[in-house]
Structure formats: structure tokens, C-alpha cells
From Swiss-Prot:
GO terms for biological process: carbohydrate metabolic process; fructose 6-phosphate metabolic process; protein N-linked glycosylation; UDP-N-acetylglucosamine metabolic process. Residues 2-217 form the Glutamine amidotransferase type-2 domain. Keywords: Aminotransferase, Cytoplasm, Glutamine amidotransferase, Repeat, Transferase. The gene is glmS. It catalyses: D-fructose 6-phosphate + L-glutamine = D-glucosamine 6-phosphate + L-glutamate. Its main location: cytoplasm. This is Glutamine--fructose-6-phosphate aminotransferase [isomerizing]. Residues 283-422, 452-590 form the SIS domain.
Amino acid sequence: MCGIVGYIGQNDTKEILLTGLEKLEYRGYDSAGIATLNDNGVHVTKVKGRIATLREDVDTTIDSTMGIGHTRWATHGVPSVMNAHPHQSTSERFTIVHNGVIENYNDIKNEYLADVSFISETDTEVIVQLIEKLHEKYQDTKKAFSEAMSLLKGSYAIGLIDAEDSETLYVSKNKSPLLVGLGDGFNLVASDAMATLRETDQYLEIFDKEIVLVSRNYVEVQTLDGQVVERKPFTAEIDASDTEKGTYPHFMLKEIDEQPIVMRKIIQEYQNDNGQLKLDQDIRTAMKDADRIYIIAAGTSYHAGLVGKEFIEKLANIPVEVHVASEFSYNMPLLSEKPLFVFISQSGETADSRAVLVKIKELGHPALTLTNVPGSTLSREANYTMHLHAGPEIAVASTKAYTAQIAVLAILAVDTARVKGLELDFEPLQELAIVANAMEVLTDQKEELEQLARDYFGTTRNAFFIGRSTDYHVAQEAALKLKEISYIQAEGFAGGELKHGTIALIEEGTPVIALTTQENVNYSIRGNVQEVVARGANAMVVSMKGLEQDEDAFVIPHVHELLTPLASVIPMQLLAYYAALHRDCDVDKPRNLAKSVTVE
């Protein structure tokens, strides 16, 4: 959940590192630091706080053409300058940055480093001290680095500088994302291609347990035992301008507004020249052959999976289970004879999901990944991949990836139904085009939604979202958005569950937002609204055109009943955005969170 960047070349290292870290700040922002190497040695600058603070502290007079940087989300040790990366060995010859969690760091300390004094609370310092200890034994940095990597258990993406070798960055990874960016007379290392898009669009994948020697003019990939690995580079499908806010005050608002564009992009990508659905034949076969689908996801992706379950069961007549990734390995259900696992992850790097993928691959079961990042770990390791085509999502709170996931799941469900020969009165591409138009109408109603956010969330500490059927899943996502960025305690409930306990929490002025977009439950959810109003709640009803009543606070345009989450979630996202804005919260980088959860 941290971000690392490295550079070796001819240009000003400091600016490249700082700019790269700014692009990676969504991965963590508890603390940050850089280390640069020149003829006078290694220069380390670390701060508690964000990259802007680091910029202020960096000595701009120090010239260097080689360095590493890190932005941290704390796992071992509190956020502090002492625990911030880069970390150095006792002699200061070796300097390291690390993303991940070393599970056996205490064992290594006891077995190899009993005589070493540590200055931080991190597992990362153990790695760099181990490398120094092994270098004393071998007098060879690559050998020491390789053996150290072989001793580590857990997840890591590592960049190392040897103060006595200005020609090589030493790099390795296991279960954590890391790429090498390729340039002319320079090369880079980064957790995410977004960090280095201004320098290059050519990248080399690094696989687990590989050692990479990065020089100015070459990159050599080796196995842990020194065998050279040949690998072709790939071109990143991201434009650098897509990672900028432009005229928007926040990435989140920009990404909310981009959702109509994303819907049209998905239509384009999943439509053939005849206007029919276009999917990989292997995916079609896998879906048709499956007797049960197991959706594995976390957070917002899990909420999208709940909507996807309804699509697949209603349209394709295949039973579906949706599981929280972090719990699945502990409580694996009895699997069907022909299961297909569907992993949903914006980043394609979610550690909990990857752990499940590794487990089910060992069992020989097929896997399909829905991800926004081509070439990501889940995409690479699953049997099949469907891309979301949402473009880079920078804000920590997911918006456009959520709606992209739902749209792609709808396409997958309809295509599977047709492959199975089932009759459907539902054309997803045409209906998604209608959704895109509805989204544009909704994103133009910001002033109205901003006022509603002031009225309902201005001073509250708690809020409840209720819905029935599909609206219940949107209520869960709406609550997550509000709590993520405004720090209001919010929960999403099934309307029918209110009387089974939750209604005890309703008191005078408690905001309750009720969603009603399904005709068959409209009467019931309005009954729930009356129940909470009778107990003092400040109720807001958000309804769909055709189901509205005069007292409703907000009405969304009519869309197909299967796709209502794509429309009803837009006002929920904007309510959360304005609630956070008016409470002076950091919308794009909420406290204690990171966008890409790459540790379990």
C-alpha cells in the first residue's frame, strides 16, 4: 500500500522522484522520503506527512542522477520520520525502499541480526541490515541482495542503492506490484506506470522472486539463482494527461463527471462491427460451462459484485455467490463441480484477492478478472481478463470504476445468457447508452445535491441509507462513500431489516436516505421511510422518474430497472463529495486509507 519510485540516468533525480511520488501518493501518505547518490555519498530526506512537505525539505542544491523514493502507508511502526523510508544499513552503504509486509522479519532479526542495533520499528530496516550482513560475508552486492530476497517471506517490492556502485539499482518483488520504465539513457522503477508516464510509456514487467539490475543503458532480469530472463517490453495504455486534475478542484469530482464517457467507452470496446456484443470466446466458454460463479472482491468492488450476482442469476440462470476476499480463505465454502471464480478489482493488485486466486489455482479452478489496469497481477495470473476501460482512477474513493464494473458485469451476464440460448428482452449496449445520457443529466445537478448535502450532513455524526432489492446494494455503496471521505459514521441497510434492530439507533434529526428505483418494492420502502420519520429521522427519498412523489428530495431519470444502480449511485457519490468538502475533509486522500490495498 506504499509507493516506490527509482531513477538512474542523466537528468535531475530529485524532481523525477518527487513528481513520481506525487503520482503515487494515492497509495499512501503517512510519510515520505527520497535518497539520492552522488560523488559525496547518499543524501536522505524524510518527512512525516505528504509529498508537498517533502518538497519543501529537499536540498535543491544537491545534484544527482540516481535515486529512490517512497511514500508510506504505515504497517509496521507508527507514521514518523524515524519509520519513514528510505532506510539505511548501519554503515550507510546500503539504502532501501520497500512496499509490502515481511512476515518473518522477527525470525531474521533473531537468526542473523542479533548484534545489530535498530533505529526504527519497521520490517524494512531488517531487510537492509540483512543485506549488509550478507555483503560482509560475500563481498558482492548482487549475491547479498539475491540471498536476502530468498530469505524473505511475505510481500515486497524493493529498490536498493549501494553507495559504492553508482551504476546499478537493485530491484526485486514478490506479491507486490513493481515495473521497470525504459528510456533512452535512463531507466526507472515504479509501483505504478502512472508515476513515470512523463518520462516513458515503455515498461518491463517484473515477476515474483526475480532480481532486476537497472542501469542507465540496460536492464537485466535474473532469477534468484542468477539465470538471465528475456522479456519483451509493453506500451502503457495511459495518457499522462489522464492523470491530471485539469480544471477540477479534486480528482473525485473529475472522475464522477467522467462516468458518462466511461459508459460510452465500454459500449465501444464491447461492441463488434455489427453492433453485437464482443467477448473473448474463451470467456464465453468458461461462463457457459460453469455450474456456479464465485465472485471475489473487496470494498466498492464487492458492492459491484452484489449487483453482478443479480445480473448473472436473473439473466444467465447461473447461481452466484459473492465473497469478501479477505474472509474467503478462512471460510471457503463447499465448491461446486464446475466453479468459475470472478475477481473484481480496480487496481488488479488487491492482496486479499490475489491470495484467493493463488489458492484456487492450486485447486485447478479457472478464474476471470475484471480490472481497470491491463497487465496487473490479477490480470496476469487469472485465466481470463475483462478490462473496465475506465481510465486512471486517482481519488482513493472509487466512483467511475464502480459503475464500469457494473456495466461490464451486465455485458458479461447478457452475453452468457445468449451463448446458452436463453431469450432476453434486454439490449445492454442500447440501455447503457441511455444510462450515459442519464448520468450527464445527474452530474449537471451539482448545486441541488450540494444543498442537500449541507441540509442533511452538515452537522450530523451518523447517517443511514436504506433500500430494498437492488437499491439495498447501492445503499451499501453510498454509505461506504460517505464514511470514507467525510468520516460520518454511515451504514447501508436493507429496508426490511430496520425493525430487526437498526431502528433503535434512530433519534431526532438522524439522516436516513432511502433509495427507490424498483417498482416492486417502492411501496415497501416508503413504508420504511414513514417508520423512521415517526421516530424523528430527517428522511431524504431519492426515487426514479415514474416512481416519484411530491415530497421526494431528488429524482433520477428513468433507466432500465436492471441498470438503476448506475444512475442512482451518481447522486450518492456527489452527496458524499459535498459532505466531505463542507466538513473540510481531504476528498481525494482521506485519512488512514490507501487506494491500492497491496498487503493482506
